[in-house]
Amino acid sequence: MSFTPGKQSSSRASSGNRSGNGILKWADQSDQVRNVQTRGRRAQPKQTATSQQPSGGNVVPYYSWFSGITQFQKGKEFEFVEGQGPPIAPGVPATEAKGYWYRHNRGSFKTADGNQRQLLPRWYFYYLGTGPHAKDQYGTDIDGVYWVASNQADVNTPADIVDRDPSSDEAIPTRFPPGTVLPQGYYIEGSGRSAPNSRSTSRTSSRASSAGSRSRANSGNRTPTSGVTPDMADQIASLVLAKLGKDATKPQQVTKHTAKEVRQKILNKPRQKRSPNKQCTVQQCFGKRGPNQNFGGGEMLKLGTSDPQFPILAELAPTAGAFFFGSRLELAKVQNLSGNPDEPQKDVYELRYNGAIRFDSTLSGFETIMKVLNENLNAYQQQDGMMNMSPKPQRQRGHKNGQGENDNISVAVPKSRVQQNKSRELTAEDISLLKKMDEPYTEDTSEI
């Protein structure tokens, strides 16, 4: 018997027949003579709008049972942990969860500004013995093919899964068993969410790990007569961004104007709702550091929550429930120091709280948390101490090093002996001059 994904029925337990929940589809006389190696292959399917790519890319003339996985970050590998990767579907037992993900290289299109934009690839799943590589054995090294199987599946035999008829069977949204680690930089079509980060895992040499790509999006949701291409949504989004003067592939640059807008937007929020970042620093949000606000120093004051070390500290932050029910709260009315005196005065209250966050050395990242806390608690005291240190004496211009006590004497205008006020002994000439000054003045009437 063969299994049909997405169809529920009673299961039959037998050593010769695989059990499952799918509707049993018994093969007719012509199907029974089909060779095992060719099971699941179409002879030559009719090309439709959903299987043709007008501007480059490889054609996928086979219909997958599941929606695709799309790459949205360049340079990310498409890979799964050993024993994971096959999507789940009602009616298919774990023993049939084996096959491969096929990379569909999509083409490029012209944007409104005349540039060619390459669409990132997409991956689609095919059961073992079906799809474009139905003849290939499990584990064969093929570019654009990534083999996956559950731990209960026998990879030496093809999966007993019927082909999908897009006119009667819709594509099933891709879902995985709990605990599956999805590739980083990819998202499941139709889910609207990016896939969780993947763990790096060693693969056997028979499993080829290739660059991520994607196949046709929701191929089963479109009939063969549909004129809508699977990449039309991406093209429309890119055209809209091009009209707005934005490039979806380039990160948006933050200018002084946008930084000012971001800062003002943050400052317009209540104090307890602000999140400091590069555009709005900790001091701008909450004021200078001091005894009452004693956390933060160095780069963390500049970057705020954008600091790479902040996320691990955020794990210690209490929840709203812990804040209200695990703290000592006190409501106090305070003086309104802000606002225009001409405007009606508002009553201002403070909800003061006192609590504690308890953790021990078994906490994940304990050493890093302690390091960050020690670096930022009361860091303002060290900064204030550095600012209060006496500045290094600067050498005046026009002097050479090593002049010592003469460095404080100006050389622009030399001082006279009177200005210098230097003491010296009187000479005989000085004494004679002083005596003449003491004699009475007499007018000289002698003729020349």
Curated annotation (Swiss-Prot):
Q: Which InterPro entries match?
A: N_prot_C_CoV, N_prot_N_CoV, NCAP_bCoV, Nucleocap_CoV, Nucleocapsid_C, Nucleocapsid_N
One Pfam family of this chain: CoV_nucleocap
The annotated region (RNA-binding) lies at: 52-194
Which segments constitute the CoV N NTD domain? 61-190
Q: Which residues carry this modification: Phosphoserine?
A: 167, 191, 390, 423
State the residue spans of region: Dimerization.
266-384
* One cellular-component annotation, GO: host cell Golgi apparatus
Residues reported to bind RNA: 106, 122, 164
Q: Where in the cell is it found?
A: Virion; Host endoplasmic reticulum-Golgi intermediate compartment; Host Golgi apparatus
Residues the record lists as Phosphothreonine modifications:
174, 427
**Spans annotated as Disordered:** 1-55, 158-231, 266-293, 385-448
Q: Where in the sequence does UniProt note compositional bias of the Polar residues kind?
A: 29-38, 45-55
Post-translational modification summary for this protein? ADP-ribosylated. The ADP-ribosylation is retained in the virion during infection. Phosphorylated on serine and threonine residues.
Q: Locate the compositionally biased regions of type Basic residues.
A: 266-276
Q: What is the effect of changing residue 107 to R?
A: In strain: Isolate ATCC VR-759 and Isolate clinical OC43-Paris
Biased-composition ranges, Basic and acidic residues, are 422-439
- What molecular function does GO assign, one term? RNA binding
Q: Which family is annotated?
A: Belongs to the betacoronavirus nucleocapsid protein family.
**What's this protein's function?**
Packages the positive strand viral genome RNA into a helical ribonucleocapsid (RNP) and plays a fundamental role during virion assembly through its interactions with the viral genome and membrane protein M. Plays an important role in enhancing the efficiency of subgenomic viral RNA transcription as well as viral replication. Attenuates the stress granules formation by reducing host G3BP1 access to host mRNAs under stress conditions.
Question: Quaternary structure per UniProt?
Answer: Homooligomer. Both monomeric and oligomeric forms interact with RNA. Interacts with protein M. Interacts with NSP3; this interaction serves to tether the genome to the newly translated replicase-transcriptase complex at a very early stage of infection.
- What is this protein called in UniProt? Nucleoprotein
